[in-house]
């Protein structure tokens, strides 16, 4: 797979942590990391690392601690905020930050209101979702019960979201719209070319040259076997302060790639 990272995106690093035994065992496909990655990328961040860990306090704490040590601008986690015994993200994050886990009154009021509206009593298990690291700010979850957890630590925006995809997406958007402090001033744009009958290895030299020439991100995604009717999805992406400049650069790259594909007897498709 041909991939060279655009150097001017590096300053705005982000990291993603997925928490859950079901992800590690393969029972659950990690679609949350994919969504979070694309959303952060659209904001101008470069996602440097995605980590998946077990539902264990020490594992979770270690993942957060190591991510913090790498000093990204943003860390987003998913999973482990529910009412069951194995939901341990809040405790792990508190341990990583070196602070106590405490009942967050604002979070408790959010949870209480949702259960009271449905005339459902509060149990210790339901109350558990209101425990957060000292100093944390709860993030509204309009699709479920457990609020997200937001902490600003060492100039890093840290967000913990629930594992249920629709809840994760909602909490992430609420965080972006209301709380995110580290905002890149870069614009991010991407485009795609779909081609048949060109092997990835044949196109690789052209991609390498264009990356050097235009300082842009180009990635080829094989959609079939290299030696048997090859099909490629080619991603062209760029970021910068001026949107029009990025558009022009992408169009120039597309033009030269299409010329290379023609020389290699490739067939352009509108989609896959």
UniProtKB/Swiss-Prot annotation:
Domain of life from the UniProt record: Archaea
Give the Pfam families listed for this entry: MoCF_biosynth (PF00994)
PANTHER family with a match to the protein in the record: NICOTINAMIDE-NUCLEOTIDE AMIDOHYDROLASE PNCC (PTHR13939), NMN AMIDOHYDROLASE-LIKE PROTEIN YFAY (PTHR13939:SF0)
* Family to which this protein belongs: Belongs to the CinA family.
Q: Which NCBIfam families match?
A: PRK01215.1 (NF002291)
What name is this protein filed under?
Protein SSO0103
């Amino acid at each position: 797979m041909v991939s060279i990272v655009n150097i001017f995106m590096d300053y705005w690093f982000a990291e993603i942590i997925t928490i859950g035994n079901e992800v590690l065992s393969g029972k659950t496909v990690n679609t949350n990391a994919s969504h979070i990655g694309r959303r952060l990328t659209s904001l101008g961040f470069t996602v440097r690392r995605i980590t998946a860990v077990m539902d264990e306090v020490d594992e979770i704490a270690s993942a957060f601690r190591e991510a913090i040590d790498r000093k990204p601008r943003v860390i987003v986690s998913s999973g482990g905020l529910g009412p069951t015994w194995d939901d341990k993200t809040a405790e792990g994050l508190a341990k990583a930050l070196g602070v106590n886990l405490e009942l967050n009154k604002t979070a408790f009021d959010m949870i209480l209101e949702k259960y009271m509206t449905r005339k459902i009593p509060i149990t210790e298990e339901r109350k558990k979702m209101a425990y957060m690291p000292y100093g944390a700010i709860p993030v509204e979850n309009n699709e479920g019960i457990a609020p997200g957890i937001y902490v600003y630590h060492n100039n890093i925006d840290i967000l913990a979201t629930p594992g249920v995809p629709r809840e994760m997406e909602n909490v992430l958007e609420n965080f972006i719209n209301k709380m995110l402090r580290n905002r890149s001033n870069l614009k991010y744009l991407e485009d795609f070319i779909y081609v048949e009958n060109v092997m990835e290895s044949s196109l690789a030299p052209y991609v390498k040259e264009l990356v050097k020439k235009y300082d842009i991100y180009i990635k080829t995604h094989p959609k079939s076997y290299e030696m048997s009717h090859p099909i490629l999805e080619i991603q062209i992406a760029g970021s910068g302060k001026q949107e029009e400049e990025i558009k022009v650069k992408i169009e120039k790259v597309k033009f030269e790639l299409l010329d290379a594909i023609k020389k290699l007897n490739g067939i352009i498709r509108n989609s896959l």
